[in-house]
UniProtKB/Swiss-Prot annotation:
Function: Transaldolase important for the balance of metabolites in the pentose-phosphate pathway. Involved in xylose fermentation to ethanol.
Annotated GO biological process: D-xylose catabolic process to ethanol; pentose-phosphate shunt, non-oxidative branch
Source species of the chain: Fusarium oxysporum f. sp. lycopersici (strain 4287 / CBS 123668 / FGSC 9935 / NRRL 34936) (Fusarium vascular wilt of tomato)
Name assigned to this protein: Transaldolase
Pathway: Carbohydrate degradation; pentose phosphate pathway; D-glyceraldehyde 3-phosphate and beta-D-fructose 6-phosphate from D-ribose 5-phosphate and D-xylulose 5-phosphate (non-oxidative stage): step 2/3
PANTHER family listed in its UniProt record: TRANSALDOLASE (PTHR10683:SF18)
Family to which the UniProt record says this protein belongs: Belongs to the transaldolase family. Type 1 subfamily.
Pfam family, one: TAL_FSA
Enzyme class at the top of the EC tree: transferase
GO molecular function: transaldolase activity
Active site: K133
Keyword annotations from UniProtKB, A to Z: Pentose shunt, Schiff base, Transferase
Gene3D superfamilies: Aldolase class I (3.20.20.70)
Amino acid sequence: MSSSLEQLKATGTTVVSDSGDFASIGKYKPQDATTNPSLILAASKKAEYAKLIDVAIDYAKQKGGPIDQQVDDALDRLLVEFGKEILKIIPGKVSTEVDARYSFDTEASVNKALHLIELYGEQGISKDRILIKIAATWEGIKAAEILQRDHGINTNLTLMFSLVQAIGAAEAGAYLISPFVGRILDWFKASTKKEYSKEEDPGVQSVKTIFNYYKKYGYNTIVMGASFRNTGEITELAGCDYLTISPNLLEELLNSNEPVPKKLDASQASSLDIEKKSYINDEALFRFDFNEDQMAVEKLREGISKFAADAVTLKSILKEKLA
């Protein structure tokens, strides 16, 4: 009997590793990997990654300039160093996140993305192996549209909690989206004081809805479920384009022989009754419809704030080392 992880891959789902701790991901044979400021912060506290920080610090010192500029340079280089090491282990792409403080600034997001791609290029890594991760705000969706259309840079729109965000992302031509599962479940459990089975899980339902909408209307944007609390959420999404999974849950799947039947099927979406909507040229409608979803609004706010705070913590570590 093959492992649940192998069975998941056999449903057509591409398995992605959600970790900055690249020393731990090779054995799961993921295609791609995702990182974010929180994951990089966690990994950077481990002794085995100190040499990456040293490279980033040396780079920033050589560039010089005011201390805040050096800190920014060190952070960008650190993200790229992690990405570079991860790409030695995986055959596919790595997602590198734009600082969450630019989540409401299209131009700054585009400029930061171009800079990160330039830094990767200096390391001999072509842009086709990188996904630039941007929060799926209105401004982030517009940044993705510019990066995809004008620069041929592939984007991963993250912190996605609603179909409204997903529709905007697809219309923008984003390469991939990361609809969150576990954080949606967290909100509903806190809000309703109820427990949910894996079948009822509102995070799972959200990804299914987005997947079916994309397949019904022929969008090529990849749906990559993210933020899982347990393996049940993962196996309920078997057949989703991609799933990005933390090493501890990858380990559980590797050690399990529970059957994993396909649950999401693109060929069945065409018969579903789903209304088509458009947001890409209507910011007011996007904002209104998104605002109607209390969970999505609260979770997007929280997610941006948390990623931004972890980037600040990471910068303070770098600032100490630059002093």
